[in-house]
From Swiss-Prot:
GO terms for cellular component: ribonucleoprotein complex; ribosome. It comes from Bacillus mycoides (strain KBAB4). This is Small ribosomal subunit protein uS11. Keywords: Ribonucleoprotein, Ribosomal protein, RNA-binding, rRNA-binding. PANTHER family: 40S RIBOSOMAL PROTEIN S14/30S RIBOSOMAL PROTEIN S11. The keyword Hydrolase does not apply. Transmembrane segments: none annotated. The keyword Kinase does not apply. Located on the platform of the 30S subunit, it bridges several disparate RNA helices of the 16S rRNA. Forms part of the Shine-Dalgarno cleft in the 70S ribosome. One of its GO terms (biological process) is translation. The gene is rpsK.
Length: 129
């Protein structure tokens, strides 16, 4: 039986001017996804995908690097302006937004879409270190 060679599809260059940056910032990691206005992903990056491990994943610097990496790929697709949606309580929220602006993308709006429970699940107990 012939063995299939693992061929990767070449990324098709899209020409998209405006998009949305979804920043998911948790206590452990920061994930940045850049999409078009319909929500179709153009590029994504995270602190863990860039090689940060353990407690270094949750730092603002790691979030900044993730935002830079995602914006570099998205700008190749022609992305220029962004709306930013931020979700989660993590340390990398502001750092990721600043990195997107520094990369040359124009931020038109910042929206906080962190889910707030109407007294749903019991939160984790306090840490005693």
């Amino acid at each position: 039986m012939a063995r299939k060679t693992n061929t990767r599809k070449k990324r098709v260059k899209k020409n998209i001017e405006a998009g949305i940056a979804h920043i998911r910032s948790t206590f452990n990691n920061t994930i940045v996804t850049l999409t078009d206005t319909h929500g179709n992903a153009l590029s994504w990056s995270s602190a863990g995908a860039l090689g940060f491990r353990g407690s270094r994943k949750s730092t603002p610097f790691a979030a900044q690097m993730a935002a830079e990496a995602a914006s570099k790929v998205a700008m190749e697709h022609g992305l220029k302006t962004l709306e930013v949606t931020v979700k989660g309580p993590g340390a990398g929220r502001e750092a990721a937004i600043r990195a997107l602006q520094a990369a040359g993308l124009e931020v038109t709006a910042i929206r906080d879409v962190t889910p707030v429970p109407h007294n749903g699940c019991r939160p984790p107990k306090r840490r005693r270190v």
